[in-house]
Amino acid sequence: MGGAQSEFDATEAKLEVADFAYTNQNGEEVSLSDFEGDYWLADMIFTSCPTVCPIMTPNMRELQDMAIAENLDLSFVSFSIDPENDTVEHLKGYTENIGVNDAYWDFLTGYDLEEIQAFALDSFKAPVEKTEDDFLHSTRFFLIDGEGKVIRIYDGLASDLSDIKADIQRTVK
C-alpha cells in the first residue's frame, strides 16, 4: 500500500491474533492457520443480541457482498461471545436466515465464555463481559493480514460504509 496512511490503520497497536481452532456453522473446524496468507475481517457478535449486533451483522454482510462483487480475496469471521446458546445448529439457522455465503463467512463457536473472553482480549484488546441478561463487547471490525496481524480497525456501527469499503479495496488486492 502506498501513499497516505489510512485513517483506519492499526499497525502501531501491534495486535496479533492468538492461535485458535473453533467450529463454524457447518460443524467444520476453522483455525488461524486456515487464513495464512489471506486477509480476513473479524468481529464479535451473539445471535440473540438486541442492540448492536443487528447493525453490525448487516454491515458485515454488505462488506461481504462488496468483496464478492469486487472479487477480493477476503474472508469473514464472526466469533460468537455466547457459545452456550450459539451452538453449531443455531448458528447454521441464523446464517441461513441472514443470507451468509458460507464459502466466505464463518460464524464460530465451540469454546466456553472464559476462552472467548481471553481470546478477544489477547487478540483484539477487546473485553467481553457478561451482564445479568446481556453481553458487552466490541463493535469494531478487525482487518487481519495473512500473518495474523490486525492492520485495520473499522467502526462496525458505521451508517455509511463507503470509506470502509474504499479502504478495504485499497488494502486487499
Go through each PLM region and give its residues.
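N-terminal targeting signals for export/organelle localization
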Residues: 1-19, 23, 171-173
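Short loop/turn microsegments at loop-to-beta-strand junctions
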Residues: 17-18, 39-40, 138-140
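Short active-site neighborhood of thiol/selenol oxidoreductases, capturing the structured segment around
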Residues: 32-54, 60
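Sec/Tat-exported extracytoplasmic proteins
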Residues: 39, 64-67, 71, 98, ...
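Second-shell loop/turn segments in exported
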Residues: 42, 46-49, 80-81, 105, ...
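Structural microenvironment flanking redox-active thiols in thiol-disulfide oxidoreductases
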Residues: 57-119
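Thiol-/selenol-based redox modules, centered on thioredoxin-like
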Residues: 126-173
